[in-house]
Amino acid sequence: MKLTSTVLGARDPRALAVFYATLLGWSIKTDEPERVTLHPDDGGPGLSFQLEPDHVPPEWPHANGVQQMQMHLDIEVDDLDAAGAAAIDAGAGLAAFQPQEKVRVYLDPAGHPFCLWTRE
């Protein structure tokens, strides 16, 4: 078995793909109305974005009675502040709740949480 992609649902899969392509420096490989895929140039596992017309953004942090986060992406960076600025410039929002010092939680344009983190 080989993991090839993680799939995120969105009302506008192409817009979300463009956001992550900008953030990660990856290329769009497949661009269809209901599914867009990205992969790094090294051929590793990528990200796919599929049309979910009724997508409801998850609530971060967890709250009872609202849409729950089912997964999130962890993205290792060298410089947390510079990467955070790039994420904001690409269209992310900084989450109000920040649980750890070496991790920053952001919300992508579809409302999915993702983390930028550094080892240092």
Predicted regions and their residues:
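Vicinal oxygen chelate
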Residues: M1-T4, W26-H72, G84-P109, R119-E120
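N-terminal amphipathic alpha-helix initiation
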Residues: K2, L8-D12
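Short hydrophobic/aromatic beta-strand micro-patches
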Residues: V7-G9, D74-E76
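Amphipathic alpha-helical segments
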Residues: D12-S27, A87-D89
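Residues at or immediately preceding the N-termini of alpha-helices
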Residues: P13, L80-D81
